[in-house]
């Protein structure tokens, strides 16, 4: 889980425009005190949302975080609020794929969710490639849903159902190497079709 002491790193990432420009959230300047309160709140409430640190395989250093939000135990659904890999050295690497895979395992095998949703800006090719690489289905596009950088952006909405997850899991489709290759192929195709 994210720890209150992680606020120094999350503050650095939350105030880095290059990291935040492709997220669906608004870019905001925040003080370290506000960030400290945010990290404390995220690390002490795990009923409706869970924030997990992503750590490097080689040295166990925190390189980012991933969140599970809108956890609904009645409807058995939740939302992947996003993945932030703040350390540029580790972007689009094995750590990212393993973090998402662990979240899927936790969501479907431990929280007993039936679906996990996710969304991204239409122009965020990497997020699209990743969600499709993990077999999320496109459920629709919200027109001009996100206001960012002085203009409105369309948002793609995806979902991964438990039956889809377990079918691909039993086929071995979520092996890290296969997933990385699928994502790379998707990126290439999306850039070509752009």
PLM region descriptions:
Residues 1-7, 58-194:
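Acyl-donor (CoA/ACP) binding surface of acyl/acetyltransferases
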Residues 10-11, 19, 35, 80:
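Hydrophobic pocket/interface hotspot
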Residues 18-39:
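Conserved GNAT-fold acetyl-CoA-binding loop/helix
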Residues 21-23, 51, 168-169:
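Short, hydrophobic secondary-structure boundary micro-motifs
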Residues 40-53:
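A short helix-loop-beta-strand connector motif used in the catalytic cores of GNAT acetyltransferases and
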């Amino acid at each position: 889980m994210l720890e209150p002491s992680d606020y120094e790193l999350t503050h650095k990432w939350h105030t880095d425009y290059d990291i935040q420009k492709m997220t669906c959230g608004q870019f905001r300047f925040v003080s370290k005190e506000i960030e400290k309160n945010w990290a404390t709140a995220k690390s002490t409430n795990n009923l409706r949302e869970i924030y997990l640190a992503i750590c490097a395989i080689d040295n166990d250093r925190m390189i980012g975080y991933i969140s599970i939000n809108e956890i609904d135990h009645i409807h058995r659904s939740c939302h992947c609020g996003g993945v932030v890999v703040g350390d540029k050295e580790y972007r689009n690497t094995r750590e990212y794929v393993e973090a998402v895979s662990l979240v899927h395992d936790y969501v479907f095998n431990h929280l007993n969710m039936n679906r996990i949703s996710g969304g991204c800006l239409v122009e965020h090719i990497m997020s699209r490639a990743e969600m499709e690489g993990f077999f999320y289905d496109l459920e629709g596009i919200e027109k001009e849903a996100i206001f960012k950088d002085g203009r409105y952006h369309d948002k793609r909405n995806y979902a991964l159902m438990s039956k889809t997850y377990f079918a691909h899991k039993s086929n071995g489709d979520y092996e890290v190497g296969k997933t990385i290759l699928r994502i790379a192929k998707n990126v290439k195709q999306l850039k070509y079709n752009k």
